[in-house]
Amino acid sequence: MDLNIKLDKSGELFNESKKYLVGGVNSPVRSFKPFPFFVKSAKSCFLYDEDGNEFIDYCLAYGPMVLGHANEKILNAVKEQMDFGTAYGVPSEKEIILAKEVINRIPCAEMVRFVNSGTEATMGAIRLARGVTKRNKIIKFEGAFHGAHDYVLVKSGSGALTHGAPNSPGIPEDTTKNTLLIPFNDEGAVRKVISENKGEIACIILEPMMGNVGCILPKDGYLKFLREITEENGIILIFDEVITGFRLSKGGAQEYYGVKADIATLGKILGGGFPIGAIAGKKELMEQFSPKGQVYQAGTFNGNPISVTAGIETLKNLNNAFYKETAKKAEILSNYLIETTEKYKIPARVYSVASIFQVYFNDKDILTYDDAKSSDTEKFMKYFYSLLENGVFIPPSQFECCFTSIKHDDFVLEKTMNAIDIAMKKL
């Protein structure tokens, strides 16, 4: 594949990388043909690669960088913390400070357990739900991605779907037999599976908007329905807010949609660009974690002072004006995508919520995993490569979503729209 862009150094690094790293990358979502560009630095809403190319970034490390890359306030706070140590193995006051910030924002949060990733957060939340209810089965929605662990890596989204492995080898059937799969946005399917497994379901886990299969929004009233039916059946409702937490609003999807879960899992934005995850929920549930209760969860780097410091500084800067501005930027780009696909008569559906957006090359509405899978992925990749050639980087998959940050200014948006027009004209 010939791209009209200089990537000589990235090509050399990729060839070397393949000798030492599986597939040349450390996460499948970073892999695309002929090879990914290698980043040398990042600042504001830009990535700079080893060949000197500048890219406007709408991937934002798959979501965390809402304040832009190399944000000075975060860097200064982290540099100051580094003088006091980088890992302790005992508690620090900053863990309390960040926990309070989470509790003040996330509606269901009465207590918090910090972990190191979104994967750890969902794994711990599911274990907690099973431990509390003494039930084994969980409900998961087709296409939802809740991390790379055995409980949920079944009909999964994100890189698992992009690279053709939504059901990973290496996961025993005995593990996945307790994972009940149903389509998103289908009330009848929820009622049916609960009825067929009465008293056996520990939890329903879901992304309130499915951000790992593009951008699939919940139907009006759907989240409220899930809240009601879980309460009626003693099922714990887990919102996986690794993407939506602190992005849709101060209180994440729960505040945005007006539905309160029992447990929320968090990550990405919470760490301000550093590794972190969190499980946040009702006190009577959270206190079942050890050492207070019997459900075991632990980690050497849980509550790491560097990540916690970055998280505190990040949340300080997420006010109402921030949410209004970042949502407006996504709305501008979404409207332009609609305008250009219509202008060039390209079958497409565009979805956005707050500062998240995505275009599907499809002539039908996208409400489920199967709808998303029916999209024209070849056309999407042509769109991706054209944007890349014109200095715009989006996630290289139909099954991810794009993000805006506070740093995407009017000039950047104008350049982006010009690149979109060129891409759509080619299609």
Swiss-Prot record:
Keywords: Cytoplasm, Isomerase, Porphyrin biosynthesis, Pyridoxal phosphate. It is found in: Cytoplasm. It is an enzyme of class 5 (isomerase). Its EC number is 5.4.3.8. One of its GO terms (biological process) is protoporphyrinogen IX biosynthetic process. Belongs to the class-III pyridoxal-phosphate-dependent aminotransferase family. HemL subfamily. PANTHER family: GLUTAMATE-1-SEMIALDEHYDE 2,1-AMINOMUTASE, GLUTAMATE-1-SEMIALDEHYDE 2,1-AMINOMUTASE 1, CHLOROPLASTIC-RELATED. HAMAP family: HemL_aminotrans_3. This is Glutamate-1-semialdehyde 2,1-aminomutase. It comes from Methanococcus vannielii (strain ATCC 35089 / DSM 1224 / JCM 13029 / OCM 148 / SB). The gene is hemL.
